[in-house]
Amino acid sequence: MSGPFERSELLAEVKRAQEGPPLLLTGPPGAGKTTLLHAAVDALAREGWHHVYLDLLAAATSPERFVQSALAALPDGLEGRAAARAREADHLSRGGRREGARAVQALLSTWAALDTVEGRPIALVLDEATEIRSLAYFSGLREVDAPFGAALAARPRGTLLATSFPGVARKLWPHLATLAMPPLSAAELQGEARTRGLRVDGSALAAASFGWPRYARILLDRLEQGMALATAWADEMALGGRLEQACRHTYEVLLLRSRGYGMSKAVLAAVAAEEGLNLTALVVRLGRTPGAIRDYLGWLLAVDALRTTRKRYYYVDGVLRLWVRLHARGVRASEEEILACARELLATAAPLPAAEAVAAASRHQGLMEID
């Protein structure tokens, strides 16, 4: 599987996990983590690897259902310890909720023992790995993240993970190697635009999307329809637009993973109105004690809704920040307000240096990319 943005350097970095310890990809929703995981799977398959892929966001429901989903992803022909533990996990998972914890433990032992099948090495690829904590509410699995981490650490090669919550992952598995997904550069976006036959400045597209592939893809689709960038951004950020819906989903997910739902919305609104505020300034704006605001900020930092630099607070996802300013205030944003926001955003874009633009174009000439 390949996406519309060729990220060969990142793919090469990820592929190093085929002969090393587990590697965790991190980044906000829409950063391209899943696309890169699938690109790695395809690259490994061309080299003779078999893969076991599981999306824990969908699979980590009840213990027995989780185990059955994971077992269904295993290849036929397993032998030795891996096969024995897989049979045990299957038997226990069919015993109902009383055996759920033991079934999960048997599955984790299966993963730890996966090595080869029919002479082909096995890659274990787990998307949204921190979702394993969804099982912690079931009997016997309160600390399920510990044996999960131990099972992964026992694998000498071919283990790839991804998460939208790097703060949670660092707390659970501090020794896990990580690779943060960087935003797309203006040059990369310029190159992709040229492959689509578009004349658009990469810096403007980078400003409009903050470099995140999900947003950039939406905007490029509209540009292909002949729409100007500011108009495309405003149209897709209007209620029901794809930018608006993507941000709304991310906003709700982050709040549900955080704590203090109502007041956390107020904190996000304050930071959206003015980034770079410190604790003292936020206390004044929100009318709560420093201790209370510090707690809310800590919870939002923990789910990577916000980041901090020199004790000042910023959004991880700049497009989400603008969505909060426009749509999280209780009244409907007008078309004029949304378009003005788009124009203000694009006014901050620095032109892409000519040499960089030419280099980007040459890298993409003759390439056809599909999603």
Question: Where do the protein language model's features map onto the residues?
Answer:
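Walker A/P-loop nucleotide-binding motif
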Residues: 21-38
